[in-house]
Amino acid sequence: MLWKSLIALCVIGAAVAEQTPVFLWGANSVAKPSLKTVSQVEFAEQLAALLEDHMVVAFEENGLSSKDFLCSNSQAQSCYAQLQGVSPKTYYTSVENPSEALRSVAAKREHNSIDASGKLTTPAKCAVGTALFVTFEDAAESREASLESHDAAIAAISKQFECKVAYLYLAAPSTAPVVQRRTRRDTAATTGGIMWKSTNQFQIFYTALLYNGNPITVTDLKLTNSSSTKLSVVMDTSVADKPITFDVVYNGGYFSLSNLVYDNNNFRSSGVNAPTTFSYSCGNLTLESAAVNNMYNTLSFKSLQLQAPFDGTYKEDFPFGDSWDCVGFVTPGILMGLFVVALLLVIMFVGVCWMMDINTMDRFDDPKGKTITINAAAE
């Protein structure tokens, strides 16, 4: 039984050990026969010698195999056009756990990643004896396009180091986490409508603008900085001398609309506000003016979204922040539902209490006892 257990452990150990290709360049190294697997210990000794006078940068490619080095693009050119021209270089067909071998001999280890633009997310400093592990962000593209973009990124990053550097291109360990990043997107669709922008200070989007149910056409937007906490916006319309004017005021981390005027009517806009890092969003915003002779005017925005960051670090054409919706968390429908549920609970509680108050009779007719006789006498 003991020797069977030892054989099983050896088989499991051989299965767990990862044997992947490694491409090394930037330093002289000993070539190995292509049919021979370089053990982890042997490869670690070779890397330890390199770390004495080199910095080692390891680019870890997810799922790298020998077939990837035969990759070609749509123009029948190699996906590794940049790596083909480096020297000196050595290709190892099979190396046992190359990443672990580097980790075991590197006293100083750093980790970094390459973003979608092909640049390091954190600037790296050149230091002899340091092992830098670089991963790639996953992108929704073909394997050929991914390898080709990684090849260009590796070539660009290799030129940034001024000290002696040995580079490794190897497979990422199967247990290594996959780097994923969320791309910021607009929280509301900005297609099929009208967008007005003023540098990096203010932008507004809507699909329709109505005054008492009649459409309004905006021809231009002008913005004036009244102060560091107040913007004055003028939206010229197709009707002469009838612009839409309003102020955007910053207070306590929020921006809000005030003094909205159109056609000499002042509309109530006290509820139009949001944090500066968010965008105010409303599917159907209808503003009303003060009633005159029991009549009032309405100004409606369909699919409205606007934002005033009050932050100079924003770029022009900045994307809208997360949506700050005009509909409150507790809507009338939710309130009605809660009221109905509470009413049903009260009815159920009262009914259960009544059922618990039902008492049985404390006296019963005994069939073995004396018969109860009731004489019915006529009076």
From Swiss-Prot:
- Any one GO molecular function term: ATPase activator activity
Any one Pfam family here would be Ac45-VOA1_TM
UniProt entry keywords in alphabetical sequence: Disulfide bond, Endoplasmic reticulum, Glycoprotein, Membrane, Signal, Transmembrane, Transmembrane helix
Which InterPro entries does its entry note? Answer: Ac45_acc_su, VAS1/VOA1_TM, VAS1_LD
Q: Where is the signal peptide?
A: 1-17
Q: According to its record, what are the GO cellular component terms?
A: endoplasmic reticulum membrane; proton-transporting V-type ATPase complex; vacuolar proton-transporting V-type ATPase complex
Hey, which stretches end up on the Cytoplasmic side? 355-379
Stretches assigned to the Lumenal side: 18-333
Presence of the UniProt keyword Nucleotide-binding in the record: no
- Specify where it is mainly localized: endoplasmic reticulum
Annotated membrane topology: Single-pass type I membrane protein
Give the disulfide map. C282-C326
The superkingdom listed in its UniProt entry is Eukaryota
> Where located?
Endoplasmic reticulum membrane
Q: Which residues cross the membrane?
A: 334-354
Protein purpose = Accessory subunit of the proton-transporting vacuolar (V)-ATPase protein pump, which is required for luminal acidification of secretory vesicles.
Q: Which PANTHER family match?
A: V-TYPE PROTON ATPASE SUBUNIT S1, VACUOLAR ATP SYNTHASE SUBUNIT S1
Oligomer and partners: Accessory component of the multisubunit proton-transporting vacuolar (V)-ATPase protein pump. May interact with ATP6AP2.
Q: Which family does it belong to?
A: Belongs to the vacuolar ATPase subunit S1 family.
Protein name, per record? V-type proton ATPase subunit S1
Report the source organism: Drosophila melanogaster
